[in-house]
């Protein structure tokens, strides 16, 4: 019996790529899903300048680069850059030969069919993987929480999904997708900071604002009340030091930015807030499963990491639900990585081993096999 080869699990988010080995309890590599290209031509010979940089290296040289995210709203829009990110993941981050390991990738719910096929094709033809599988992100988050039934609110950098799952099956007719997530909140924070006189405009400066957002923002339990408190005292104000040493103060922006999750109208979007989207999704499900969904609302993704978000969600959903309904919000501390963790669990199950698409099956059937084997 030869030694089991660990599968590689890669969760390609719009903002961050999480990668590692099946069976581990956390991803080994977490880096920004960015490809950067120099804005200026190099004038110094022998500096070893590259024509593109990926991930943290792109981030650290962002002052001289134009940064591009190949995944927008959870869906790959630039395959050349995506290939660079996968190449970087295998060879630089995990330091593995992809032709020796099965590869599990994740995808957004309601991902276009052509995208799944392209993904499959690249993994087999460019990277020569021996086996491949693609799994829906929200379903993996639910696995990670140890459930098979629940409704997952998965909000990352590029897209927010609400996915009801019953006994391990996503209910496709009730899935909702909102193209509003972390990146939009960052942009909104840039906008409201500009009103205060702090101007951030380049792609590099946007990353500073993202850091401010991650460190200082929170969700208010009662927005109107919080606005009033903020206007009357300065106890909600916090300071932040910019890379050049300048210190800026932010006040009500701390909770005004994430409030867009509950009131997308401030971003000029017509969709309802995440609470309304979740409620509508539950209402699209069969009346018999609703109780189980209300009792298992699972949050996942980086944009659910704001302090106060679970309490606010509890309050909003309780107000919408029938009065006798027991509403429970589950917000596991590791939810930033729960999609990856779910993938790690799935790919190491003994029962899963017959689910992989093998290279041989791919060679016989072509990319469309992904629709038959992965659901």
UniProtKB/Swiss-Prot annotation:
Reaction catalyzed: ATP + H2O = ADP + phosphate + H(+)
GO cellular component: cytoplasm; cytoskeleton
One Gene Ontology MF term: ATP binding
Record's keyword annotation contains Kinase: no
UniProt superkingdom: Eukaryota
EC numbers: 3.6.4.-
SMART domains on file: ACTIN (SM00268)
Protein function: Actins are highly conserved proteins that are involved in various types of cell motility and are ubiquitously expressed in all eukaryotic cells.
Name the record gives this protein: Actin
Species in which this protein is naturally found: Exophiala dermatitidis (Black yeast-like fungus)
């Amino acid at each position: 019996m030869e030694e089991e080869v660990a599968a590689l699990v890669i969760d390609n988010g719009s903002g961050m790529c999480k990668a590692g080995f099946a069976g581990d309890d956390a991803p080994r590599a977490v880096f920004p899903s960015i490809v950067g290209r120099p804005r200026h031509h190099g004038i110094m010979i022998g500096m070893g300048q590259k024509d593109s940089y990926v991930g943290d290296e792109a981030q650290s040289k962002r002052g001289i680069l134009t940064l591009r995210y190949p995944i927008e709203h959870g869906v790959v829009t630039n395959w050349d850059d995506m290939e660079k990110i996968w190449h970087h993941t295998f060879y630089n981050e995990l330091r593995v030969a992809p032709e020796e390991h099965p590869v599990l990738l994740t995808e957004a719910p309601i991902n276009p069919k052509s995208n799944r096929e392209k993904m499959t094709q690249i993994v087999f033809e460019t990277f020569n993987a021996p086996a491949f599988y693609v799994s829906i992100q929200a379903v993996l988050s639910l696995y990670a929480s140890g459930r098979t039934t629940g409704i997952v609110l998965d909000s990352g950098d590029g897209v927010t999904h609400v996915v009801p799952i019953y006994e391990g099956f996503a209910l496709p007719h009730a899935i909702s997708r909102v193209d509003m997530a972390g990146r939009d909140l960052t942009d909104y924070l840039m906008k409201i900071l500009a009103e205060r006189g702090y101007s951030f405009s380049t792609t590099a400066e946007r990353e500073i604002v993202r850091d401010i957002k991650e460190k200082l923002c929170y969700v208010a339990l009662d927005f109107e009340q919080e606005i009033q408190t903020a206007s009357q005292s300065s106890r909600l104000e916090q300071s932040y030091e910019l890379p050049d040493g300048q210190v800026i103060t932010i006040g009500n922006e701390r909770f005004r930015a994430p409030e867009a999750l509950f009131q997308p109208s401030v971003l000029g979007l017509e969709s309802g807030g995440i609470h309304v989207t979740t409620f509508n999704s539950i209402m699209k499900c069969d009346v018999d499963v609703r109780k189980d969904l209300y009792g298992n609302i699972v949050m996942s993704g980086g944009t659910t990491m704001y302090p106060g978000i679970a309490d606010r969600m509890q309050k909003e959903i309780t107000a919408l639900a029938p009065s006798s309904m027991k509403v429970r919000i589950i917000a596991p501390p590791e939810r930033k990585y729960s999609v990856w963790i779910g993938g790690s669990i799935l790919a190491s199950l003994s029962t899963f081993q017959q689910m992989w698409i093998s290279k041989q099956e791919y060679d016989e059937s072509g990319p469309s096999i992904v629709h038959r084997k992965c659901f």
